[in-house]
């Protein structure tokens, strides 16, 4: 979770909101792009039936990207009926171990890009394209 926090807060104009029970949400211009979800009846442990307490939500660019992530062989990403037709994927915190630091950063950046103002996103992309070339 520390790396998620670092990556999210490195994005321009991002703020971190923390719920009363300590769950972080990352927001850019009032728009949520990633969060630690509270227990919900739509996300339950398949073995115990208990509501999951360790679910992260990441926005994605579109439903095509969502489908690609859901088809990932590692089985890290999932969804629930609540998110049908919505460009977001879910992931359990223990499954962060299955993705490396760069992939997590990319997930956060892509989520942020879906919610950031176009001007801010364009500037960020230009700055980072120059650094990598």
Label each residue range with its predicted role.
Residues 1-133:
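Charge-dense, helix-prone N-terminal extensions
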């Amino acid at each position: 979770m520390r790396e998620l926090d670092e990556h999210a807060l490195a994005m321009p104009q991002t703020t971190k909101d923390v719920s009363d029970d300590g769950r972080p949400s990352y927001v850019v211009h009032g728009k949520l792009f990633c969060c630690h979800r509270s227990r919900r009846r739509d996300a339950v442990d398949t073995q115990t039936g208990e509501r999951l307490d360790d679910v992260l939500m990441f926005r994605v660019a579109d439903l095509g990207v969502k489908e690609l992530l859901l088809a990932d062989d590692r089985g890290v990403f999932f969804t629930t009926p609540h998110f049908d037709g919505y460009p977001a994927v879910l992931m359990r915190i223990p499954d962060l171990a299955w993705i490396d630091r760069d992939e997590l950063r990319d997930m956060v950046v892509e989520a942020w890009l879906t919610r950031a103002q176009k001007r801010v996103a364009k500037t960020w992309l230009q700055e980072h394209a120059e650094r990598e070339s």
